[in-house]
């Protein structure tokens, strides 16, 4: 009963009710204006015409244009108004202004720290053009001198994650889409409290929508009371606006600038299988011990300072000593930004698919992509590339699952192999090609990740973990789908 009441009076329910109330109010006001119907209808039709013209001139993916133009033309009275409310990126002006200029000090911070290289370090090697693109459009340089560890399950990440939190001496930076009180988050929080007492600087960013069901509205104030610097990213305002877009979907943990984690896991019990709402939960992660961790420090501080603008001298967070590590390949951490026109995550995935010579293996919880991505996957299979995609057998969102399944037949007909992870839900976000290149991070293969969210990942080339990622992708339990396919939830 208590759980039901908590659900009924949760922030998300209240927010949705307030939005619904505003919609009803708007419809009532329109009804009151029925005596001016001709004038109101003319204005709304004009608004729809302007919206369509704006979309036609806008530099965005054609499939996104079409997704808006068709309903606007079908429902011209309300279509333009809905586009005005929901068709734009809406961000705080301060954040937008800062993020547009954040890349200006990327190279300087990296190079002054003497930890990074330009992409020319791999010139002549297969992924050079991809690394060069990511350098030019994300400000991401290339790192060596880093020990890399791959984890096929969140359960595997957890012990090392806890040990590294406990070992931090100077600072801990955490940035996650979801924090949810339970064994995982409560354990992390107790460690963070102890670290604050030891004089370690602790900062936390969580996404307000991602955590809306789990923590109170002003949870960040509770964290501040413990001495943890904290902020809720892009806080929910229950007005007719795009509250579900432009979220901070990144997963970043940095300890002392020497150790960093990223991957698909959040700070909630299902990610380490302490609870099982959808069967066995599979999520992967990567640990970087060495120079590449510094880049994740920069990525965290970029976003932090876009809100608070506290740190004038980011190099003060640079590790005092650069330890020598075995050079386990080349790493290029990157982040995507919905304020930019460049869909970096989508382009990285597409380029890896187009460049593949032998195979493309993909883990993704969702598969809702544009026509260009579908064409790239189908064309790769048709030219003899072994293309395999692993998606969940048990969905976390049934509607999204059906949308994912709607792509299967078209891909199967082209020769793409589709597998469903039979033990439960796969939340890993990973793409692997040709025994030498992988990208691991927070990016789903859907348009929300590609176009609407802040995401992160790391390109890894010529590393020992490539074989581990391949083994993971080939050894998971799955059902191989074939035509004809009956798609049921």
Question: What are the language-model segments listed below?
Answer:
Residues 1-347, 351, 355, 395, ...:
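N-terminal localization/anchoring segments of enzymes in phospholipid and broader phosphate metabolism
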Residues 201-202, 386-388:
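Residues at the starts of beta-strands that form the adenosine-phosphate
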Residues 252-253, 429-431:
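Short beta-strand scaffold segments in enzyme catalytic cores
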Residues 336, 363-364, 391, 421, ...:
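Thr-Gly-centered strand-to-loop micro-motif
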Residues 366-385:
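Helical hairpin unit composed of two closely spaced alpha helices linked by a short loop
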Residues 372-375, 389-391, 396-413:
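Extended hydrophobic/aromatic segments used for targeting, binding, or gating
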